[in-house]
C-alpha cells in the first residue's frame, strides 16, 4: 500500500511538471513571430508584446482585448532557471566589458608614458654621444693646431717624409707585380726562422756513454724499407705492419713524408708517398700510418709485421735496422722510459735514421723521432703506435705481454688514445675538393671483374684473431690513385682479380663505429663494446670494466689491504721497546730488542784447503796472512764499537762547507751527470700516491731483486729467509706489494722531520737494519784488532721502496757509465773492457794517449782511496747527493721530493739490529748503509763531490775508489772527515793498470784463500762442485795475464781426478 502511494505521488508530480513545461512552450508569447526573446530570457513577463495579426485575417466583428501579463508564479521551474541563467550571463558580460574597457585605457596610457620616456632617453643619449664625439674632434683639432703652430718646421718635414715614403711604397708595389714574390719573401722567412724559431727535437743523436753493437742482419719479414727524395738520395725509413682491419700499412715519422718515395732494395721499384692515404697522422706525436695503392706490397716486396701499441710497451732491449753501403745492419738499443708522449731510447743514431723502427724480436715498437733539445736529455725518443680499436688493436681484450711493466702511465695512454681517436674521426670527416674521397670508392667491377655483393648475401661475421687476419688491400681504383707521371705500373693478374678487396680502413672504421666517441659496434668484429681510451684505475688495456669485474677487483683490494694490516700487526708484535743509554756503542743507544732469528756461525779453514796447502806449499805461502772473521752478536758489537768511535772522532774534527761552496759543488755535479737525467717514478707524478703507476714501478722493482738475498728484519719472523719465498708465492706477493704501497703512503703523509730513529720504525716509515759481519777473508791485522767489515742489510720492503724511488736513475748511470763520473756499470773482466775504460780516462784527464797515461799517470791523474768511507759519510753529504738526484729528475714533483726526503731521513737515522735481537738507535745522523740499494750509486757520487770540494777539476769514482785531477788538494779531505791514501801506481777498483790492455787484480791472495777455504768439492754434492768450478774459472779469468800462475792454479785446483770422478 505504501509502495503504491509512493508510485502514485511520483506519477502525479511527473505529470504536473510535463503539463507545466508543455503549457509554457506553447504560450502565444513564445510561439508567435515578434516575441521578444530577450524579455523572456530576462524574466520580464509583465509586458509581453501582443502578437501581430493580419487585419484581413481577423473577423470584422471580433473585439480584441489585451491580456494581463502572467505572474512569475505562473511560470514553470524550467523557465525560471533559464531566465536566471540568462540574467547571470548578461550581468557577467556587462562587468567584463567594463573591465576590459578600463584595462585598455590603462595600458594605452602606460604605453604612451613609456614611449615618451624612451624617446626622451634616446634623445639625451644621442646628444651625449654627439657632444663627446664633437669634443674629441675639437680637442684633437686644437692639439693639432697648437702642434703646427709651435713646431711648424718639424711638422712640415714630417709631412714631406710621409709623402716620399708613400711614393716609394707605391713604386715597390708596382715593381713587385713584375717579379716573383718569393725572391723577397724567402730570405725574410729564412732570417725569421733562424732568429726566432726553436725546434724542440733534433732528428738524430748519438747517446753519450752508450755503446751498442751492429751486426749484418735483415729486418723481420723485410718490413723495413728506405724512403728517398725524388732525386734518389736517402731520406729516412718506413716500416710495414699488419693492421687488425686486415690491411698492410706503412708506419713512419710524420716529418719524413714530404716529397718522399718508398723504395725497395729488392725490386728497385719506387712509389711516391703521396699515393698513400693516411688512416692516422699526428704532427704532435710525429707518426703516420698509411695504406697504399693496390699491390704496393708486391711492388716493394714487403710483408706486414706484428706490432705493439703504446699501452703495452715495456722497458727492455730492442734493435733497429739501417742501410749501410747497400746492406742491412742491425743495431742495439734499450727502451728506457717515457718522455712526454714519446718513449726514451738509448741508442746511437745518425743523419737519415728518422722513421726507422725499433723492434722487440719480430714486433715493431715504434719509429725513431729524434732527441729532445730543450732539456738536453741524453737519449733519443721513439714515436709510438696508438691503440685504435679495429685498426691497431682488436675490439676485445688481450692480456698484456709486457713482462717488465708498461713505459707509459695510464694518463699518458689515455691522452694518446684520445688524440688517435680524434685524428681518425677528423680523417673520416674529411672531404676533398671534388666532394669524393679515394677511401669512399667501392671495389671497381671494371678493374677487377668482381660482382658487388648484395646486402642480403653479406657473409657471416667472423671473430677477429690475434696473429692471423685475412690479407687484403685497400679498395681503390687504379685510375684514381695513379699519378700523372707514373714511376711504375700497376701489377695485374688472375691472383689479383680473384681476390676480393676489403674496404679502406677508414671506411671500415666508420662502419664499425656509431659516431659516439669512437665506441665500436659489437656487431662489427665479434668483440666487446669498448670505449677508445676508457680504462679503469688498475686496467692494463684501457677497457671499461663490467660490474662483475669491478666487484672482483674491489674484493681483491679489500683482501689485500686486510692481509697487509694483519701482517703489519704480526710484525709489530715482535718488538719490545725500551731505551737504555749505558753500555752502548758511541753514537747509538739501546732502544729495545726482538727475538734472535739469526744465528751466524764462524767459518773455518776447510779440509780441502788445508790439503791443497800441504800438497802445494807455494799456494800456502800465497794464502798466508788471511783468515775468517768471527760471527755473532759479540763480534758485531766489538767491531761496531771500534768503527763508531773512529767515526765520531773524525766527525768532531770535520767541518761542513759553507752554503756557497755546497751550491757550487752541487751545480758542478749536476752538470757532470746531465746525461743521466731521468723521469720521476710513475707513482708520484700526481699530488697523491697513484696505485696504477705504483703497479708499474713495483713490477720493475720486484724483477730486479736478488732472489737469494735475505729478507731482513722483521720479515724473517715469518719463516721465509730469502726474497724468493715472498716473490714467488702468488699469495704473498700481493701482500708484499700492499705493504710497500702502505709504507710509501705513510712516508708521504707523516711529519717525520723531528722523529728519532726508533720513532721512524714505530710509525712504520722504515724497518730496522740487520747488522752482521761480512763472511769474507780478512787480513790478520784486522782479525787481531777485531775490526771486521760490517754489513747493514736493509729489509725487503725498504729495498722495494728505494727501488721504486731511485731505480730509473741508478739503472741509467749503469747504462751510461762512459759519460758520467760514476763507474758502477763498468767491468775489467776482459782486455776490451780494460782498453775501453782507459780510453775514457784518457779523454777526461786530457792525456795525449793511453800509453802516455799508463807510463806517466802521476802527471795526469791521482788514484786515491778512502779508508772507512761508509762510516765517514756525513748527513750533509747525503743531503747534497739527494739534491743532485732531484735536480736530475726530469719531471720531478713535490710528492717525489717528499718521499725521497722521508727515505733520506730513515737511512740517515737508522735502528740497527744485532744477531741476538738487540736494537740500537742512531743518535748522530749519517753513515752510509752498506746494504742499501743506493749505496754504490750514492757513494760514487759523494766521492766525486768530495773531490770537487777539494778543488779537483774532474773525478771519477767507483764507491770509495777514485781517480781525480792532479790539482786536487788532499789536505782538504781531512776537513771533510775522510782519511785518504794516494796510490803509487795507476790503481782503480782493486786493479793496477800496467798497459792499455792489462789490469792486474790487487787482491789475488785474498781471492785464492776464499776459493780454497770457501768450498769443499770433496763432499760429492754436484751443485757444490759446479759452484766451485765456476769460482775457479772466474779466478783464472782474472789472472789471465799471468800464464804461469794460471797453469799452476789449474793444475792445483782442478786435478784430473776431480773432473773424472765427478
From Swiss-Prot:
Signal peptide: 1-20
Keyword Nucleotide-binding: yes
PTM field: Specific enzymatic cleavages in vivo yield mature proteins. The protease probably cleaves itself and releases the RdRp (Potential). Cleavages have been shown in the P1 protein, but since the N-terminus containing the serine protease is shared between P1 and P1-P2, cleavages should also occur within the P1-P2 protein.
Transmembrane spans: 121-141, 144-164, 172-192
Compositional bias ranges of the Basic residues kind: 497-511
Swiss-Prot/TrEMBL catalytic activity: RNA(n) + a ribonucleoside 5'-triphosphate = RNA(n+1) + diphosphate
Protein name stated in the entry: Protein P1-P2
Organism annotation: Potato leafroll virus (strain Potato/Netherlands/Wageningen/1989)
Organism phylogeny: Viruses, Riboviria, Orthornavirae, Pisuviricota, Pisoniviricetes
Amino acid at each position: 500500500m505504501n509502495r503504491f502511494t509512493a508510485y502514485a505521488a511520483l506519477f502525479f508530480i511527473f505529470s504536473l511538471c510535463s503539463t507545466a513545461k508543455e503549457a509554457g512552450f506553447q504560450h502565444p508569447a513564445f510561439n508567435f513571430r515578434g516575441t521578444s526573446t530577450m524579455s523572456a530570457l530576462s524574466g520580464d513577463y509583465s509586458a509581453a508584446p501582443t502578437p501581430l495579426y493580419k487585419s484581413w485575417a481577423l473577423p470584422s466583428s471580433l473585439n480584441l482585448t489585451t491580456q494581463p501579463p502572467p505572474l512569475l508564479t505562473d511560470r514553470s521551474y524550467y523557465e525560471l532557471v533559464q531566465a536566471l541563467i540568462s540574467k547571470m550571463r548578461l550581468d557577467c558580460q556587462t562587468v567584463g566589458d567594463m573591465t576590459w574597457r578600463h584595462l585598455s585605457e590603462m595600458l594605452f596610457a602606460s604605453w604612451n608614458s613609456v614611449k615618451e620616456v624612451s624617446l626622451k632617453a634616446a634623445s639625451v643619449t644621442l646628444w651625449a654621444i654627439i657632444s663627446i664625439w664633437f669634443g674629441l674632434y675639437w680637442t684633437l683639432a686644437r692639439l693639432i693646431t697648437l702642434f703646427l703652430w709651435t713646431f711648424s718646421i718639424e711638422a712640415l718635414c714630417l709631412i714631406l717624409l710621409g709623402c716620399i715614403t708613400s711614393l716609394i711604397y707605391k713604386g715597390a708595389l708596382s715593381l713587385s707585380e713584375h717579379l716573383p714574390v718569393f725572391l723577397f719573401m724567402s730570405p725574410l722567412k729564412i732570417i725569421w726562422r733562424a732568429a726566432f724559431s726553436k725546434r724542440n727535437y733534433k732528428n738524430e743523436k748519438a747517446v753519450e756513454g752508450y755503446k751498442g753493437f751492429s751486426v749484418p742482419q735483415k729486418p723481420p719479414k723485410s718490413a723495413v724499407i728506405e724512403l728517398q727524395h725524388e732525386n734518389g738520395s736517402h731520406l729516412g725509413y718506413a716500416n710495414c705492419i699488419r693492421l687488425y682491419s686486415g690491411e698492410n700499412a706503412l708506419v713512419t715519422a710524420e716529418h719524413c713524408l714530404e716529397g718522399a718515395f718508398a723504395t725497395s732494395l729488392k725490386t728497385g721499384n719506387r712509389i711516391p708517398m703521396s699515393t698513400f692515404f693516411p688512416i692516422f697522422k699526428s704532427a704532435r706525436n710525429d707518426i703516420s700510418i698509411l695504406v697504399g695503392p693496390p699491390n704496393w706490397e708486391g711492388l716493394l716486396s714487403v710483408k706486414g709485421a706484428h706490432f705493439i701499441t703504446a699501452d703495452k710497451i715495456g722497458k727492455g732491449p730492442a734493435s733497429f735496422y739501417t742501410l749501410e753501403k747497400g746492406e742491412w745492419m742491425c743495431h742495439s738499443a734499450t727502451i728506457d722510459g717515457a718522455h712526454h708522449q714519446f718513449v726514451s731510447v738509448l741508442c746511437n743514431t745518425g743523419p737519415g735514421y728518422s722513421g726507422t723502427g725499433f723492434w722487440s724480436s719480430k714486433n715493431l715498437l715504434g719509429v725513431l723521432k729524434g732527441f729532445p733539445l730543450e732539456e738536453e736529455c741524453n737519449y733519443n725518443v721513439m714515436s709510438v703506435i696508438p691503440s685504435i680499436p679495429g685498426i691497431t688493436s682488436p675490439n676485445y681484450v688481450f692480456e698484456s705481454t709486457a713482462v717488465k711493466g708498461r713505459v707509459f702511465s695510464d694518463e699518458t695512454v689515455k691522452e694518446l688514445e684520445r688524440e688517435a681517436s680524434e685524428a681518425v674521426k677528423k680523417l673520416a670527416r674529411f672531404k676533398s675538393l671534388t666532394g669524393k674521397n679515394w677511401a669512399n670508392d667501392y671495389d671497381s667491377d671494371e678493374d677487377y671483374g668482381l660482382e658487388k655483393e648484395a646486402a642480403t648475401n653479406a657473409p657471416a661475421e667472423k671473430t677477429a684473431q690475434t696473429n692471423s687476419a685475412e690479407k687484403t688491400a685497400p679498395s681503390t681504383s687504379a685510375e684514381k690513385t695513379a699519378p700523372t707521371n707514373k714511376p711504375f705500373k700497376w701489377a695485374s693478374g688472375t691472383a689479383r682479380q680473384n681476390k676480393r678487396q676489403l674496404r679502406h680502413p677508414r671506411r671500415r672504421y666508420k662502419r664499425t663505429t656509431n659516431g659516439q666517441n669512437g665506441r665500436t659496434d659489437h656487431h662489427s668484429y665479434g668483440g666487446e663494446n669498448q670505449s677508445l681510451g676508457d680504462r679503469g684505475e688498475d686496467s692494463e688495456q684501457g677497457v671499461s670494466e663490467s660490474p662483475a669485474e669491478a666487484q672482483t677487483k674491489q674484493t681483491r683490494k679489500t683482501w689485500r689491504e686486510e692481509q697487509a694490516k694483519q701482517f703489519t700487526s704480526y710484525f709489530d708484535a715482535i718488538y719490545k721497546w725500551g731505551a737504555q743509554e749505558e753500555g752502548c756503542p758511541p753514537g747509538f743507544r739501546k732502544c729495545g730488542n726482538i727475538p734472535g732469528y739469526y744465528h751466524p756461525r764462524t767459518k773455518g779453514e776447510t779440509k780441502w784447503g788445508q790439503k791443497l796447502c800441504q800438497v802445494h806449499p807455494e799456494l800456502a805461502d800465497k794464502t798466508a796472512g788471511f783468515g775468517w772473521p768471527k760471527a755473532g752478536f759479540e763480534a758485531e758489537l766489538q767491531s761496531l764499537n771500534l768503527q763508531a768511535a773512529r767515526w765520531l772522532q773524525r766527525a768532531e774534527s770535520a767541518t761542513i762547507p759553507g752554503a756557497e761552496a755546497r751550491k757550487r759543488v752541487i751545480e758542478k755535479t749536476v752538470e757532470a751527470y746531465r746525461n743521466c737525467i731521468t723521469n720521476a717514478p710513475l707513482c708520484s707524478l700526481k699530488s697523491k700516491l697513484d696505485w696504477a703507476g705504483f703497479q708499474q714501478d713495483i713490477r720493475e722493482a720486484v724483477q730486479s731483486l736478488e732472489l737469494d738475498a735475505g729478507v731482513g728484519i722483521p720479515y724473517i719472523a715469518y719463516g721465509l729467509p730469502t726474497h724468493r719465498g715472498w716473490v714467488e708465492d702468488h699469495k704473498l706477493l700481493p701482500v708484499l706489494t700492499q705493504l710497500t704501497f702502505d709504507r710509501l703512503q705513510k712516508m708521504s703523509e707523516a711529519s717525520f722531520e723531528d722523529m728519532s730513529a726508533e720513532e721512524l720504525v714505530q710509525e712504520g716509515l722504515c724497518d730496522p737494519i740487520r747488522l752482521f759481519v761480512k763472511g769474507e777473508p780478512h787480513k790478520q791485522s784486522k782479525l787481531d784488532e777485531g775490526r771486521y767489515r760490517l754489513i747493514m742489510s736493509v729489509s725487503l720492503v725498504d729495498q722495494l721502496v728505494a727501488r721504486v724511488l731511485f731505480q730509473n736513475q741508478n739503472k741509467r748511470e749503469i747504462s751510461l757509465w762512459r759519460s758520467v763520473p760514476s763507474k758502477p756499470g763498468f767491468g775489467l773482466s776482459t782486455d776490451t773492457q780494460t782498453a775501453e775504460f782507459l780510453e775514457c780516462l784518457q779523454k777526461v784527464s786530457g792525456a795525449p794517449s793511453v800509453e802516455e797515461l799508463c807510463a806517466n799517470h802521476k802527471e795526469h791523474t791521482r788514484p786515491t782511496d778512502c779508508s772507512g768511507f761508509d762510516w765517514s759519510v756525513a748527513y750533509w753529504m747525503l743531503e747534497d747527493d739527494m739534491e743532485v738526484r732531484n735536480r736530475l729528475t726530469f719531471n720531478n714533483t713535490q710528492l717525489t721530493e717528499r718521499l725521497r726526503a722521508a727515505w733520506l731521513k730513515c737511512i740517515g737515522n737508522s735502528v740497527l739490529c744485532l744477531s741476538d735481537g738487540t736494537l740500537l738507535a742512531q743518535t748522530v745522523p749519517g753513515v752510509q748503509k752498506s746494504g742499501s740499494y743506493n749505496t754504490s750509486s750514492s757513494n760514487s757520487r759523494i766521492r766525486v763531490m768530495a773531490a770537487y770540494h777539494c778543488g779537483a777539476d774532474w773525478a771519477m769514482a767507483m764507491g770509495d775508489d777514485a781517480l781525480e785531477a792532479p790539482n786536487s788538494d788532499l789536505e782538504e779531505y781531512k776537513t771533510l772527515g775522510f782519511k785518504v791514501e794516494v796510490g803509487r801506481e795507476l790503481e782503480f777498483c782493486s786493479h793496477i793498470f800496467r798497459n792499455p790492455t792489462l789490469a792486474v787484480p790487487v787482491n789475488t791472495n785474498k781471492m785464492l784463500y776464499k776459493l780454497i777455504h770457501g768450498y769443499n768439492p770433496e763432499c760429492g754434492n754436484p751443485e757444490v762442485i759446479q759452484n766451485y768450478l765456476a769460482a775457479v774459472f772466474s779466478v783464472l779469468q782474472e789472472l789471465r795475464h799471468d800464464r804461469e800462475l794460471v797453469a799452476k792454479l789449474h793444475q792445483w785446483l782442478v786435478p784430473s781426478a776431480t773432473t773424472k770422478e765427478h
